Amino acid sequence: STYAAAGRRLPRASLRVRIADATWPIEAVRAVPTYRRQAMGLHFIKIAVVYLVIGTMLGAWMGSIQTFTYAPVHAHILLLGWVSLAMAGVIYHLYPAASDTRLAKAHFWIHNLVLPPFMVVLALFLTGTKAAGPVLGIASVVMIVGLACFMVNVLTNAKPAG
């Protein structure tokens, strides 16, 4: 940890948590390794890379058969999967206070539970399945809820260091 790297040891008493008044000494918070505080950002970046590979493979497949019916799916996978999640990961990595929130976790799970079926339903809609339209609308609204979690989280919890 940063605190330990500075050559200082935490006094044993400062690591105790008093349950009665639920206070944490600031030294105990500083003693938490950086990787644990910023783990949410890394989760976003890792899953973003998965979407990058999927989107790239879809694009290569469409190019190889010269059929671009699924171009909107390709674009959505890369923009909502790769770009937006990678950017969120970088923001959460730079602002660990925003990373350690329920909103960050809600954003991660909503986004990643909705995006894959959203892409399947979009593909069905593009190939003429009209019944996919209402499901596509619902998935879009849920995706917006996930992105709203991100917006509220960043606006309220992303603070400059120091």
Predicted segments, located by residue:
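Hydrophobic alpha-helical transmembrane segments of multi-pass integral membrane proteins
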Residues: 2-6, 11, 17-19, 23-162
